[in-house]
From Swiss-Prot:
GO CC, one annotated term: mitochondrion
Predominant location: mitochondrion
Gene3D superfamilies registered for this protein in UniProt: Cytochrome c-like domain
Pfam families: Cytochrom_C
Name of the protein in question: Cytochrome c isoform 2
Amino acid sequence: MAKESTGFKPGSAKKGATLFKTRCQQCHTIEEGGPNKVGPNLHGIFGRHSGQVKGYSYTDANINKNVKWDEDSMSEYLTNPKKYIPGTKMAFAGLKKEKDRNDLITYMTKAAK
């Protein structure tokens, strides 16, 4: 049986960049000043509370969750977004593999600064 996740562990930013392109970029931008798309721009997400990007229309669920994004909360969210924030409009089913989440978050922490 698989061990329960113990939180974020740094992974490969290169593999994370590929995951972002194939799994996230259709709905999100991450560069500073990037536009909101189907999902909000993710620049500066770490250290910010959920539901805070100006000009993006969030569900009440995202706003009311009021999670402060860090590597661990992002990992938990990306495991199953609809379970972590019931009522979110994020259609993405999540990344079930802990290694994939770690790689993606490692990339995001660099790209979102």
